[in-house]
From Swiss-Prot:
Domain of life of the native organism: Eukaryota
Record field: compositional bias (Low complexity): 638-658
Start and end residues of each stretch annotated as Required for interaction with VAMP7: 658-707
Provenance organism: Pongo abelii (Sumatran orangutan)
Protein name, entry field: Ankyrin repeat domain-containing protein 27
Chief place of localization: other
PROSITE patterns: ANK_REP_REGION (PS50297), ANK_REPEAT (PS50088), VPS9 (PS51205)
Region (Sufficient for GEF activity towards RAB21): 1-372
Keywords tagged on the record: ANK repeat, Cell membrane, Cytoplasmic vesicle, Endosome, Lysosome, Membrane, Phosphoprotein, Protein transport, Repeat, Transport
Alphabetical list of SMART domains matching this protein: ANK, VPS9
Compartments in which it is found: Early endosome; Late endosome; Cytoplasmic vesicle membrane; Lysosome
Region called Disordered, residue ranges: 630-665, 987-1050
Renumbered residue ranges of the record's region Sufficient for interaction with VPS29: 396-460, 692-746
Basic and acidic residues composition bias: residue spans: 994-1007
Length: 1050
């Protein structure tokens, strides 16, 4: 409702009410009623004591209100509806509401309304309803601005001094300069706390913009308008020549209707005031008043819609010819190019379009003194078409530029901005910069007054520069172009926001990093006291928070408060952004600072989880304060492990104090990089390591970074040069791809630990050492296997990482994978030749660890690949000794080794195919998403009472039919017959069968007859591979019933 504001204590109507009827003031306070007060601008004359003040005092009754003299009034939304008792049932807008108290602390409300309740019929009243949202005179502006105008005067004085030096610059330069002055003054005005609150309402913001524009232009009018007049002098002379030749033109010659002739003298007098107006806004108001006068009839006011476009344009044509204004072109140029407070789409813009169309019609020579019958209407049609075209052309050159920036059209943006370069080329061709000879005048005359030229300093009606728009729309590719063209990185809009503010508000990390690279200040506060970090925390953009903090913690000012005293940590805690809170606390944000409500970030946390995180850091913060020297000592101890690229000699030459500072700085930079890798923040990693787009595009062309082979260490031949360049490249920040932290962790190590499969190829491509060890002598492959990150393990192995390296505990990657139960990783390691029976410092093999951790599938996989069950650890225990009795693992340890041993005489290739056919393609399958079936092959044990003499078990190995059998043997054999082999004659049959197929590439599986359904229980599953039924070990002697090994092909 509060779209308009004024001091009601100075309102003439309210003052008259207090003066003439104090009894009504007392009564309305006693009954807590409502007083209706017309706004100041709607009161045409002094208020008389005979005014019916009772009609403006409202008393609530049931569902409506009554005045003190018994008239009905309804309040519906933001309008007053007059009811019974009033002669005219008007609807009056409510502008705002205030509550007043008298000396007895009795309250009553005042509703400021747009105009009085009585209908006005006198033609002497204002021509249109008073617009409370516009300022008309410089006196109104000075009253509105108050003391703020004194601050503007200093900026204006500076503008006067610099204008003389740039007088020969182009029109666009002066447009941008005047706009910059306007923006600076508006920013100063919006720093006022009261006006800042009002500015949140669009109408109030427009009022402030009008006030600043009128005041600024009034003070620089002589400079700017004189310059524009000089630029448009030749155009004005040509137009004046035409209008002078039409002085005999009569109204009837151009079809002016008689009903509109009456107001032409008044409109002519009003139009003559145009050159007395000192701002575009005032000139437009003058033109609007002319149009209103034209449309007013002698008896009553009529709306603009009652006059058609032809009627209006006929009158305007007559006024343009008959009014003595010699500089119409200068006025048009001034109004169009120096109006900053609003767009051309409002009522004032329509009035300007009408005059512009009429002027263009006259310039074309279409107007003559002939009667309309002989003139023809072809030219009139042109007039209407021109007016329609002008009304549609609402986009200024600046608007066009901003649209192309928003859409990322780099080619068009570059074309528009390169127009200014032509002006510079023209100046270079002049005799000298101040030359006025004919040749030099021809060079510059066509470009100096061209308003279509745009620059990186052009602004829209929000105060945004092109760089603001690029940041707001996330167009990182245009940041470089705009900065190279001279865009001001720290330019501020009307609300004090820089491009960095907008990028952080919208969450564009790449834009944020680019702006920081071009020295954008992270310390700038907008009108609300917010830094870019405040906005990134408010909107929860973790990536932007990290970009600001990691770039430079000191310049980011983590503990600065906004106008409410809130630090970024207050905001992140209030909205529950845990990751942002941790980032801020890790980099030194204080949890002790209080805002203006005496709240610490801890008190702002409304979430119990966030509160626990804050409290944990709060306790550590207190401990750090008590022992502040500990971190420095720790850093000093690890000076040599912070960066592989550091220079030992430079550190040794420093003093102890400077060494600690350098160590602290290097450590912080490394931690930034490692945290970005841990978070998978590719943009931040790229920025810190200074990778380019080409580096990412070539990511798939990763070469091995493990011991690259060169012709000689310094070889630069075509084969060695790419790898040499990659290994030698170190960013200017000193951060290399193999830099390490205190504990020896490198970026590749952290990426492997956190499973960042997208970063691993990039790190390896840029020279990361896959064989580098940390403080525990572990390589990245150890960590990836321990955490079960299959894709990371695959990438490292494909880059020739060694699968059998041991750490300080003697553990290999295979032992870690088996201990964690990561059967997919185990299969992959075995395929790459991992040693299966290697022991760690405790003597445990991979099989020991899998048995101890009870990972059934891993145990089966190891056994099928020949893991020994006889190896003793340092406690003299085998894997069988570590297994629980009567468990599935125990049955596996007893059954599978004998089954595998029975196949020892089979050809090696066939045996591998037989037991690992499913494992080979594990990493290429996407069918293992179900949590209850993590690996394709599962074992089921079914006990049969009639087939075994002793305690035996039967194992059925079922496989998923949806996974194709892609072994090399299966590709050559379109159909494989089911075979059956008895255990007692397996070697002999295998040998004879191999002899028969001596010329075959792949020996066939020993033939085994498949048992019928009545002889065994088979768990039904879709299968592609062979199902193996193995016999358990014989404890007391040979089994009475031979155990059959059967393979079924589905």
């Amino acid at each position: 409702m509060a779209l308009y504001d004024e001091d009601l204590l100075k309102n003439p109507f309210y003052l008259a009410l207090q003066k003439w009827r104090p009894d009504l003031c007392s009564k309305v306070a006693q009954i807590h009623g409502i007083v209706l007060v017309p706004c100041k601008g709607s009161l045409s004359s002094s208020i008389q004591s005979t005014c019916q003040f009772e009609s403006y005092i409202l008393i609530p009754v049931e569902e409506h209100f009554q005045t003190l003299n018994g008239k009905d009034v309804f309040i519906q939304g933001n309008r007053i509806k007059l009811g019974a008792g009033f002669t005219c049932l008007l609807s009056v807008p409510i502008l705002f509401e205030e509550t007043f108290y008298n000396e007895k602390e009795e309250s009553f409300s005042i509703l400021c309304i747009a105009h009085p309740l009585e209908k006005r019929e006198s033609s002497e009243e204002p021509l249109a309803p008073s617009d409370p949202f516009s300022l008309k005179t410089i006196e109104d502006v000075r009253e509105f601005l108050g003391r703020h105008s004194e601050r503007f005067d200093r900026n204006i004085a500076s503008f006067h001094r610099t204008f003389r030096e740039c007088e020969r610059k182009s029109l666009r330069h002066h447009i941008d300069s005047a706009n910059a002055l306007y923006t600076k003054c508006l920013q100063q005005l919006l720093r006022d706390s009261h006006l800042k609150m009002l500015a949140k309402q669009e109408a109030q913001m427009n009022l402030m913009k009008q006030a600043v524009e009128i005041y600024v232009h009034h003070e620089i009018y002589d400079l700017i308008f004189k310059y524009v007049g000089t630029m448009e002098a030749s155009e004005d002379a040509a137009f004046n020549k035409i209008t002078r030749s039409l002085q005999d033109l009569q109204q009837k010659d151009i079809g002016v209707k008689p009903e509109f002739s009456f107001n032409i003298p008044r409109a002519k007098r009003e139009l003559a005031q145009l050159n007395k107006c000192t701002s575009p806004q005032q000139k437009l108001v003058c033109l609007r008043k002319v149009v209103q006068l034209i449309t007013q009839s002698p008896s009553q006011r009529v709306n603009l819609e009652t006059m058609c476009a032809d009627d209006l344009l006929s009158v305007l044509l007559y006024l343009l010819v008959k009014t003595e204004i010699p500089n119409w072109m200068a006025n048009l140029s001034y109004i169009k190019n120096f109006r900053f407070s609003s767009s051309a789409k409002d009522e004032l813009g329509y009035c300007l379009t009408s005059f512009e169309a009429a002027i263009e019609y006259i310039r074309q020579g279409s107007l003559s003194a002939k009667p309309p019958e002989s003139e023809g209407f072809g030219d009139r049609l042109f007039l209407k078409q021109r007016m329609s075209l002008l009304s549609q052309m609402t986009s200024s050159p600046t608007d066009c530029l901003f649209k192309h920036i928003a859409s990322g059209n780099q080619k068009e943006v570059e074309r528009l901005l390169s127009q200014e370069d032509h002006d510079k080329d023209a100046v270079q061709k002049m005799c000298h910069p101040l030359c006025f000879c004919d040749d030099c005048e021809k060079l510059v005359s066509g470009r100096l007054n061209d308003p279509s030229v745009v620059t990186p300093f052009s602004r829209d009606d929000r105060g945004h520069t092109p760089l603001h728009v690029a940041a707001l729309c996330g167009q990182a590719s245009l940041i470089d172009l705009l900065v190279s063209k001279g865009a001001v990185v720290n330019a501020t809009d009307y609300h004090g926001a820089t491009p960095l503010h907008l990028a952080c508000q919208k969450g564009y990390q790449s834009v944020t990093l680019l702006l920081l690279h071009y020295k954008a200040s992270a310390e700038v506060q907008d009108n609300n006291g917010n830094t870019p970090l405040h906005l990134a925390c408010t909107y929860g953009h973790e990536d932007c928070v990290k970009a600001l903090v990691y770039y430079d913690v000191e310049s980011c000012r983590l503990d600065i408060g906004n106008e409410k005293g809130d630090t970024p940590l207050h905001i992140a805690a209030r909205w529950g952004y845990q990751a942002i809170i941790e980032t801020l606390l890790q980099n030194g944000a204080s949890p002790e600072i209080q805002n203006r409500l005496k709240e610490t970030p801890l008190k702002c946390a409304l979430n119990s989880k966030i509160l626990s995180v804050m409290e944990a850091y709060h306790l550590s913060f207190e401990r750090r304060q008590k022992s502040s020297e500990a971190p420095v000592q720790s850093l000093q101890r690890s000076v040599d492990s912070i960066s592989q690229e550091s220079s030992t000699s430079s550190f040794s030459s420093m003093s102890a104090g400077s060494r600690q500072e350098e160590t602290k700085k290097d450590y912080r930079e490394v931690e930034k990089l490692l945290r970005a890798v841990a978070d998978g923040d590719l943009e931040m990693v790229r920025y810190l390591l200074e990778w380019t787009e080409e580096d990412l595009e070539d990511a798939e062309d990763t070469v091995s970074a493990v011991d690259p082979e060169f012709c000689h260490p310094l070889c630069q031949c075509p084969k060695c040069a790419p790898a040499q360049k990659r290994l030698a490249k170190v960013p200017a920040s000193g951060l290399g791809v193999n830099v390490t932290s205190q504990d020896g962790s490198s970026p590749l190590y952290v990426a492997a630990l956190h499973g960042r499969a997208d970063l691993i190829p990039l790190l390896l491509k840029h020279g990361a050492n896959a064989g580098a060890r940390n403080a525990d002598q572990a390589v990245p492959l150890h960590l990836a296997c321990q955490q079960g990150h299959f894709q990371v393990v695959k990438c490292l192995l494909d880059s020739n990482a060694k699968p059998n390296k041991k750490d300080l505990s003697g553990n290999t990657p295979l032992i870690y994978a088996c201990s964690g139960g990561h059967h997919e990783v185990v299969a992959l390691l075995l395929q790459h030749g991992a040693a299966i029976n290697t022991s760690n410092n405790k003597g445990n093999t991979a099989l020991h660890e899998a048995v101890i951790e009870k990972h059934v599938f891993v145990v089966e996989l190891l056994l099928l690949h020949g893991a020994s069950v006889q190896v003793l650890n340092k406690r003299q225990r085998t894997a069988v000794d570590c297994a629980e009795q009567n468990s599935k693992i125990m049955e596996l340890l007893q059954v599978v080794p004998s089954c595998v041993a029975s196949l020892d005489d089979v050809a090696e290739t066939d045996r591998k195919e037989y037991v690992t056919v499913k494992i080979r393609k594990k990493w290429n399958s996407k069918l293992y998403d179900l949590p209850d079936e993590p690996f394709t092959r599962q074992f089921y044990f079914a006990h049969s009472a009639g087939q075994f003499k002793g305690k035996t078990s039967r194992e059925i190995m079922a496989r998923d039919r949806s996974v194709p059998n892609l072994t090399e043997g299966s590709l050559h054999e379109p159909g494989r017959q089911s075979v059956t082999l008895r255990q007692n004659n397996l070697p002999a049959q295998s040998g004879s069968h191999a002899a028969e197929k001596g010329n075959s590439d792949w020996p066939e599986r020993p033939r085994v007859t498949q048992t019928g359904p009545g002889h065994r229980r088979m768990l039904r599953r879709h299968t592609v591979e062979d199902a193996v039924v193995s016999q358990g070990p014989e404890a007391a002697g040979p089994l009475s019933t031979p155990q059959e090994v059967s393979a079924s092909r589905s």
